[in-house]
């Protein structure tokens, strides 16, 4: 497990995102849950982001803790998320987790996939 400290963090996990994840974990009633962010092949631009709750931390995961919430990223996804910001937004169009990724050379119209 590779823990990153906030001074040398290669990605940003915003207070809004951590707060929403904490709220969702409390709703689940399982304080052992962690947020796993990952990149998979697919979508119209080649890659897409995924979010899931996980109780297990794999040996090669990169972990980050913010406001009592642990974020997990596997090594394959890590390379695509360096420099990215993981945020949660609420607006007229609804609420959603958003990844602002400087490594994405293009994104699709729906915003759920990207190419790098």
Curated annotation (Swiss-Prot):
Co-factor requirement: iron-sulfur cluster
Pfam families: Fe-S_biosyn
Entry keyword set: Iron, Iron-sulfur, Metal-binding
Classification via InterPro entries: FeS_biogenesis, FeS_cluster_insertion, FeS_cluster_insertion_CS, FeS_cluster_insertion_RrpA, HesB-like_dom_sf
Amino acids binding iron-sulfur cluster: 44, 108, 110
Keyword Cell cycle: no
Cofactor binding: number and manner: Binds 1 iron-sulfur cluster per subunit.
Keyword Membrane: no
GO MF annotation terms: 2 iron, 2 sulfur cluster binding; 4 iron, 4 sulfur cluster binding; iron ion binding
Any one biological process term the GO annotation gives: iron-sulfur cluster assembly
HAMAP family (alphabetical): Fe_S_insert_ErpA
Subunit structure: Homodimer.
Sequence similarity: Belongs to the HesB/IscA family.
Record function comment: Required for insertion of 4Fe-4S clusters.
Descriptive protein name: Putative iron-sulfur cluster insertion protein ErpA
Originating species: Dechloromonas aromatica (strain RCB)
